[in-house]
Amino acid sequence: MTSFGIIVFPGSNCDRDIATVTAGLLDQPTRFIWHQETDLHGVDVVVLPGGFSYGDYLRCGAIARFSPIMTAIIDHANAGKRVLGICNGFQVLTEVGLLPGALIRNRDLHFICDRVTVRVESNQTVWTKGYQSQQVITLPIAHGEGRYFADGDTLKALEDNEQILFRYSNAQGELTTDSNPNGSLHNIAGITNVQGNVLGMMPHPERAADRLLKATDGLAMFIS
């Protein structure tokens, strides 16, 4: 059994979607953790869900990084335990420094709600062992500030350390401008920390995990 702790900030709106997968579909112990709590006792995997934490005031994730629960999340990550940030959760992880870079306004400055094809770069991680390396999967996206940006040295380190776990691609797995929905540098859709236990991604695997929706490409993320 894997115990999931789903962080709930003011403005989170994908927390119950994740619980539907972890508790409803997979029957794993799951609890909601309000952002003012300070204890992650008994939690194996921390999930920071999508949404608009604190209304995205100042900058996406900029206020959530100061929530009391973040100290415990940082300790959890530094202990080598798993932390997953999806969409707004990814933004929070960059703001708090658990992942490098930043998520900025989409290339066309519009909110994007669509399904995209994403290439799994490696299956040699705890998050992707249920996939094949270079496998192309389809996942939903819904964001206005999902364009990954980092300086040249950071991008080189991400490439050299194989921290880029997901890239936007076409159905054949080719990295093209047309298949990059938001202008992310290096077609980045998701990255890990150097140790590989912290993952941030803009696509929503929890929205592609139920056979009733005829979309299950994201389910392996939660089984891994």
Curated annotation (Swiss-Prot):
One GO biological process from the UniProt record?
'de novo' IMP biosynthetic process
Q: Name one GO cellular component term.
A: cytoplasm
Catalytic activity reported: N(2)-formyl-N(1)-(5-phospho-beta-D-ribosyl)glycinamide + L-glutamine + ATP + H2O = 2-formamido-N(1)-(5-O-phospho-beta-D-ribosyl)acetamidine + L-glutamate + ADP + phosphate + H(+); L-glutamine + H2O = L-glutamate + NH4(+)
Q: What is its EC number?
A: 6.3.5.3, 3.5.1.2
Please give the Pfam families that the UniProt record associates with this protein.
Answer: GATase_5
Q: Main location per UniProt?
A: cytoplasm
**Would the keyword Mitochondrion be found if you checked this record's keyword annotation?**
no
Alphabetical UniProt keywords? ATP-binding, Cytoplasm, Glutamine amidotransferase, Hydrolase, Ligase, Nucleotide-binding, Purine biosynthesis
User: Which residues constitute the catalytic centre?
Assistant: C87 (nucleophile), H204, E206
* Subunit relationships: Part of the FGAM synthase complex composed of 1 PurL, 1 PurQ and 2 PurS subunits.
Q: Relate the protein's function as given in its record.
A: Part of the phosphoribosylformylglycinamidine synthase complex involved in the purines biosynthetic pathway. Catalyzes the ATP-dependent conversion of formylglycinamide ribonucleotide (FGAR) and glutamine to yield formylglycinamidine ribonucleotide (FGAM) and glutamate. The FGAM synthase complex is composed of three subunits. PurQ produces an ammonia molecule by converting glutamine to glutamate. PurL transfers the ammonia molecule to FGAR to form FGAM in an ATP-dependent manner.
What this protein is called in its record is Phosphoribosylformylglycinamidine synthase subunit PurQ
